[in-house]
């Protein structure tokens, strides 16, 4: 179990309260697909992902990005129980989708970049520290069901 100080919890929940999940989620997923093109294979049903322009303009990217950011809001609300929060999602990504665990870390890195770009003034090193800790905990919780 990870220990969160009151200040860390406040920095995480305070910033998360400002997040527009639609806007940030769409940007995060688009960045993931562009920067790490091998992740596109998990989204073959999305159609054209052949270029950054195609990815950004793809109508299936924003809703799935919103879904990702919305699901990331769950551990923000349950900082003391992240592993159980992601139990079902871990099972889905392990057994059905067969997503390699390294991809969770990459998505966490993208989330940090998106938060930093949208909230540059608020996303100080002191704020980044608990967020890095959170994405690391999430990246370790998601592959929990892997064998």
From Swiss-Prot:
It comes from the Eukaryota. Red blood cells. InterPro entries: Globin (IPR000971), Globin-like_sf (IPR009050), Globin/Proto (IPR012292), Hemoglobin_b (IPR002337), Hemoglobin_oxygen_transport (IPR050056). Residues 3-147 form the Globin domain. GO terms for molecular function: haptoglobin binding; heme binding; metal ion binding; organic acid binding; oxygen binding; oxygen carrier activity; peroxidase activity. The keyword Metal-binding applies. Keywords: Heme, Iron, Metal-binding, Oxygen transport, Transport. GO terms for cellular component: blood microparticle; haptoglobin-hemoglobin complex; hemoglobin complex. Coiled coil: none annotated. One of its GO terms (biological process) is hydrogen peroxide catabolic process. Heme b binds at residues 64, 93. Heterotetramer of two epsilon chains and two alpha chains. Beta-type chain found in early embryos. Belongs to the globin family. PANTHER family: HEMOGLOBIN FAMILY MEMBER, HEMOGLOBIN SUBUNIT EPSILON. This is Hemoglobin subunit epsilon. The gene is HBE.
